[in-house]
């Protein structure tokens, strides 16, 4: 895995893939949830100092986001009706509360499962998803399921790095994550996992070495875009 010194990461919460209540949600809804729960800026002062007006704390120290539908459709490169539909799915599953604000963008309160709000000092289990997989045009057409699968593969690979004990005959570090595991976490047909892996291989994010028991997986971080212009996120079909 390449040096992650210049990488920034978004948090993709694990309960979206392990709790049966949320597993059937659309992959794009889960990625939208990751965007609106981004918590790099936890105070109004920090947000203002860094010219980031998307994250705030209310009078009860609850985190909320301010994103217009136009902002969100630009980030995910989908239509405004799609954003409205994705938000509706999050609301119906108890993961989002939207408070209307007169003459301003609505407040978006991302929620943890079972009616818990996010607070400033929360620590959560999550998969790390590199920002550059959205920012770099090289990856703009990767499907939503492939992006979420990549986050899972990356987490498994990081565990191999931590354990420092999973090496092949060429002394290269690898991880194992079966197609059945991915299919179960993403709530998809097992046959689709092969397509996902092929897409990640084609993009240079994954290398696969067939093995009798389970494929050996080698995960690479995405290339960081050196273009200073803000790129739109594109989530493929």
Q: What is the predicted role of each segment?
A:
Residues 1-67, 105, 112-177:
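Short recognition helix of helix-turn-helix/winged-helix DNA-binding domains
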Residues 41-108, 159-223:
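Winged helix-turn-helix DNA-binding recognition segment
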